[in-house]
Amino acid sequence: MIKQSLNGEDMQKSLVSLAWVFVAILGAICLGVLALHKGESINTLWLVVASACIYSIGYRFYSHFIAYRVLKLDDNRATPACVRNDGKDFVPTDKAITFGHHFAAIAGAGPLVGPILAAQMGYLPSILWILIGSVLGGCVHDFVVLFASIRRDGKSLGEMIKLEMGQFVGMIASLGILGIMLIIIAILAMVVVKALAHSPWGFFTIAMTIPIAILMGLYMRFFRPHKILEVSVIGFILLIIAIYAGKYVSLDPKLASIFTFDASSLAWMIMGYGFVASILPVWFLLAPRDYLSTFLKIGVIGVLVVAIVFVAPPLQIPKITPFVDGSGPVFAGSVFPFLFITVACGTISGFHALISSGTTPKMLAKESDARLVGYGSMVMESVVALMALVCAGILHPGLYFAINSPEVSIGKDIADAASVISSWGFSISAEEISEMTKNIGESSILSRTGGAPTFAIGLAMIVYHILGDPSVMAFWYHFAILFEALFILTAVDAGTRTARFMIQDLLGNVYKPLGNLSSYKAGIFATLLCVAGWGYFLYQGTIDPKGGIYTLWPLFGVSNQMLAGMALLLVTVVLFKMGRFKGAMVSALPAVLILSITFYSGILKVMPKSDDSVLNNVSHVAQMQIIKEKMATTTDEKALKTLQKSFFNHAIDAILCVFFMLVALLVLIVSVRICSNAYFKNQIYPPLAETPYIKAA
């Protein structure tokens, strides 16, 4: 009887093993078809199946290996949420809820914008980097940083670097992290500005989310406390009404003029909004928008995945375009190394390290939950990145370039734009551009850089294929814009608040009262500094002749990837101190790859002028030299002022790029020294800062 039972178990294991072998072969076949296909278009189902297979294998086997062979997660060990359960910051939470919270926090504009910009090089480079890079790098990054924070009482990334690498390194790293945070917030806000500029329908809808969120906050605070689902449903209904009302606002000439703003005006508005929102009580605006954006985000992404499977639209953008050489109009740089920093959050993101060492480690009820929350959430984010790539890829290539190319490249007139884009080898007529503009209810789609409009048009086209009625495209386009802007603005709110705390922490070392988090005046002062920091980059991006995204996104990518590299180095140091030298390779190898790519791209961004026009477009220093030459021959006063501003902006960007590289280099050198001492000399200094073992109740 026992023998029969054992044979049955062996048979079951064999069948499971065969099933996983089949999944691996199926994934390899689908990926091979995507890579070797030579036709004009290819069905997106090949991508859907390939990604499902690769993510399943990565989560089932690689994350399990990391969890129980490298990190050795222990559910008998109490987490910070259990040890310090205060009902406020530290609260043991069901892993499904924690997963939703963490995913909502990390899935910002990055996975939507990066792959859309990278589509100028074709679909294949992005697909390969997103699939392979996320499974072996990005998901690992989020998981291991979350583990490190759990074992250190839920401490932040900067605090952990200070504990594990020393006070001086921690202080410099904290400065670097703050600078990177400001760049991240600026680029998030830039995406919203580019989506809402000259769009009365879009601006009205987003403006209405503020009173809706305040109403939700008051309702939940004073009338129906803790009824999150109920108030979110009410908020969602009001949002749908706002979208419908926005259509009639855009059709009325007087109302349309009231709600139409250019990019620079919107930048000032978002700065003012970010300042006010970050000093208001969390329950009044931030929390209700967070609830609303979380439900909306998870719901829309889920529906989009199902819709893509159901419609199976063909990818029209080529497998590889001529712009892999870096001559493309959407962003500066060749496929190596700039594809990697452009896709950014869709594969690996340093910003996630701030979340994985922020609120999330204070919510985990068991250590094993970190596998689903850390690794699993990043799997979902990379799925979002693939969905964004699909939304860009199903568009006519000419239409894609009409939307994402800056005005300086294609001009203001539709006929001129169609002619220029056709000369690039992507034939499109002015009538096709005009028809899409009319279908989505906008006055223009030319040079709507930033990724959000492209994603929205792609989503609207998928819905159109389901319903077969082009009249629905306008509603769904603006619904997608609302969806993107809502959770991006929530990230701007939360990012400004987080950066304010970081500024106060740093200022407290200079003048102690400024570090008092309970001081209202100190909080306002720190918030002003924070908003001024990210607001500067936002405003300069709006007046940039190349659209801001062209120059700002690569700087964001470099800084964000350097932050990811520093976080992986921290975990490598921790694992070396724990004596897990072989296991440390799961973080050390991605760190080496990411930092190598990022240092190379960072160096290219500060190289002097050369005969290579592509490198000159990438380099801030080269641009400064070119602008200086123009300034010497310009007599027009207005043009001279514009050139002076541009020169100053490139100088700031170059200085920041060098600073971020120096910070990352310092962390790298100290990490190598600590790991070498641990491996060769068995010297652990600074000592491992892991909190003492406390048995779970």
Residue ranges and their predicted role:
Residues I2-A24, I57-L112, T294, S334, ...:
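Membrane-interface "cap" regions at the ends of multi-pass membrane proteins
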Residues I308-V324, V379-I457, A494, Y536-G547:
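Extracellular/periplasmic helix-exit of transmembrane alpha-helices
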Residues E164-L182, G376-V383, T449-G451, P470-A480, ...:
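Loop-to-transmembrane helix boundary motifs in multi-pass membrane proteins
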Residues L45-C53, I57-V70, G176, P200-I243, ...:
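Membrane-interface loop-to-helix entry segments
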Residues S41-R60, A118-A148, G158, F203-T209, ...:
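Extracellular loop-to-transmembrane helix junctions
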